[in-house]
Amino acid sequence: MTFQNKKTLVAGLGGTGISMIAYLRKNGAEVAAYDAELKAERVAQIGKMFDGLVFYTGRLKDALDNGFDILALSPGISERQPDIEAFKQNGGRVLGDIELLADIVNRRGDKVIAITGSNGKTTVTSLVGYLCIKCGLDTVIAGNIGTPVLEAELQREGKKADVWVLELSSFQLENTESLRPTAATVMNISEDHLDRYDDLLDYAHTKAKIFRGDGVQVLNADDVFCRAMKRAGREVKRFSLEHEADFWLERGTGCLKQGNEDLISTQDIPLQGLHNAANVMAAVALCEAVGLPREALLEHVKTFQGLPHRVEKIGEKNGVVFIDDSKGTNVGATAAAIAGLQNPLFVILGGMGKGQDFTPLRDALKDKAKGVFLIGVDAPQIRRDLDGCGLNLTDCVTLEEAVQTAYAQAEAGDIVLLSPACASFDMFKGYAHRSEVFIEAFKAL
């Protein structure tokens, strides 16, 4: 792919957009920058990084009317809008940073492990990266997990990696056509981002783009959407919490198995919750697909401590355990967190619902929850979706109030779980900030 003298507009000026500007400029493109809202201080900040960079703001159509050949989109901007469709129909090319990386690794021959899914993808990406590093591979962990892929590539100055471990969101996959992973997985499909997609099937089709090429498919045998993603002629490894598969959980013994072979006991896995057994099985299958030895992988699984804000015990007071799952930003993630915990629960839900249907939480909560506390802008919708299923629902103005009220009702042996099933931006700077407030509220009890 050549960019020499190509007029290129980079849309969206967060971390991904900045990395695309840097990469495209280095490769000879004539780059301009666009954001729907640009403050003077942001222009000055970016201008110091890129001498002579031209900025556009306001309507995207007005910017595109300046004769651009390529539109490089940040993940937060959907290409499903009339201005971008018209640009493509007039011969313009639309791509994102993952497509740019795909061109690099395809030419250079780097191996790629690609991970997506509604829930669990960050944990699996981190675990796979950890295992690859522990097994001695020169490993790059990047994508939706935090470091933009082109920022990582520029830092390496073109040096080939043994393996790239990529967490990919559906947004990143929308305009990715050339990525051919050595191994890939879609961990699961549940309602998320339905404010961006037509329906759940549309969302699943976008996720399935991760399986292009002829690499190993690692499939969740318990998920109907994932089962349907099997491609003819491909090597497939299936994992299951429900029945025998290539990798499966024997419920009676709590042992992860491959066929009849015992792999590891769930008691030896530091990560809490049954859903993390699925994460471990997927991670081992992905790592084996790039040639790593099973015995070493299983030993290193035992030392992986997981990620903050993902079903993380933060403390205990008078026998009541407090668990932070602030990263549970959709219904599927929260249902998985609830399913993986055995003790009676008081659950804190709410925030920005992103157009989700919360009724699946009725079944998840009904046999586990002693009480549910609702916060945030979409608390009324959650109440409507859960009303009438026998749950004790309490509206709280703040997260601090929810923590205090839950603790007042809890008894020794109970769990207070923050797993909001919603985005956080109505009340907090992000899920990490929401977690900080939860922890401080616990400490104040």
Swiss-Prot record:
This protein's record includes keyword Cytoplasm: yes
Matches recorded under InterPro entries: Mur-like_cat_sf, Mur_ligase_C, Mur_ligase_C_dom_sf, Mur_ligase_cen, MurD
Annotated gene: murD
SS bonds (residue pairs): none
Protein's job: Cell wall formation. Catalyzes the addition of glutamate to the nucleotide precursor UDP-N-acetylmuramoyl-L-alanine (UMA).
GO term, biological process aspect, one: regulation of cell shape
Protein name: UDP-N-acetylmuramoylalanine--D-glutamate ligase
GO CC term, one of those recorded: cytoplasm
